[in-house]
Amino acid sequence: MSGLGLQGVTVETVLQNPSLQAGSTLHGEISFKGGSSDKEINGLYLQLVTMAEVESGDHEFNQPLVLQEWLVNSRFLLPAHQAHSFPFSIQLPFETPITEVACRRNGARVWIQTHMDVDWGLDATDRDYLKVLPTPAMQMFLQAMQRCGFVLSTVDVEKGQLTARNFRSTIGCYQELEFVSSH
């Protein structure tokens, strides 16, 4: 389209604290600029996304899974070539998968997807990866497993829900930590 002299809307998100723990508040700013013509924007969204392993019959595959979505701004008119920005603060769910752990194979990825829904135009998107650190309780668990003679081998995220006596997961996935004996 830009070859025809039509420039689309652009969006860029800058995260102030991309390294954080689950349950913490993420701060940032979304900057965007209008294209070659005025555009009606249906909404500006932030999505917390992970790559989840999905089991289907005898097969497994990975697919992006939206864990939570926040509406930053609803319908508005974006004039041609005008630049705007919105600061934001969002709290990550306490069940957000951790990504920063020492292991042999870490398949956990978490990112913020910015999505601008452009009416009658190409939607503008941006992806920014997060470093989700273990909480103090998770750190204590990982250290206890190590003291018991186990090494964290594999970390991944699986689509599904966990249910226990007084708990039910809420984000549509769970994190799997696989340990092996260090002996």
Sequence positions of predicted segments:
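C-terminal beta-sandwich interaction modules and adjacent acidic
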Residues: 1-183
